[in-house]
């Protein structure tokens, strides 16, 4: 989306002026209801989060492996690492997407309705992981939630919107 006025800045830099790969090293994005390619297993999806750290001269390294392993462990996905994404429950699938964003290893995570289609237990589990990531690794987490009770419980700051306007 292009802003009607103003700009979005990250570390004093307009994000529109940043190259995609540079932005992806600073900010991970988890969209709502994302659909992985058919046949992807959990570990492959999580490893996809390391793409911004790859390049022509920099291929897969030990730190990439460590980031994937850490994300799988923190999201309780180690036992599911070889399962195809489309065989997982909704909560497991959301944890896999969250693990991919974690493996990207950025200072900022943007989560667009990460609790969509999840039962309350899975919602709380995912939000607890986000809070833990914020508190233990000092990562900024910005998320969109429609449940004001969850927003109040898990957020330090809340911006309420109605019809596309901040209220």
Model-derived features with residue positions:
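Conserved ABC ATPase signature
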Residues: 59, 84-88
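H-loop (His-switch) and adjacent beta-strand-loop-beta switch element
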Residues: 158-167
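Conserved ABC ATPase "signature" region
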Residues: 47, 62-80
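Catalytic Walker B motif of ABC-type/P-loop ATPase nucleotide-binding domains
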Residues: 109-113
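H-loop/switch region of ABC-family ATPase nucleotide-binding domains
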Residues: 145-146
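Conserved ABC transporter NBD signature motif
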Residues: 6-14, 23
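Helical segment within the ABC ATPase nucleotide-binding domain
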Residues: 124-137
């Amino acid at each position: 989306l292009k802003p009607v006025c103003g700009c979005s800045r990250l570390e004093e830099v307009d994000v529109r002026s940043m190259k995609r790969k540079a932005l992806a090293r600073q900010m991970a994005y988890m969209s709502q209801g994302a659909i992985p390619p058919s046949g992807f297993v959990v570990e492959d999806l999580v490893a996809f989060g390391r793409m911004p750290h790859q390049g022509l001269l920099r291929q897969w390294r030990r730190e990439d492996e460590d980031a994937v392993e850490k994300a799988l462990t923190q999201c309780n996905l180690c036992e599911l690492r070889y399962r195809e994404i489309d065989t997982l429950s909704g909560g497991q699938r959301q944890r896999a997407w969250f693990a991919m964003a974690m493996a990207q290893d950025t200072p900022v995570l943007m989560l667009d309705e990460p609790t969509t289609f999840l039962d309350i237990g899975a919602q709380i589990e995912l939000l607890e992981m986000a809070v833990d990531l914020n508190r233990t690794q000092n990562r900024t987490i910005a998320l969109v939630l429609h449940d004001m009770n969850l927003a109040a419980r898990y957020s330090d700051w809340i911006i309420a919107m109605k019809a596309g306007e901040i209220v």
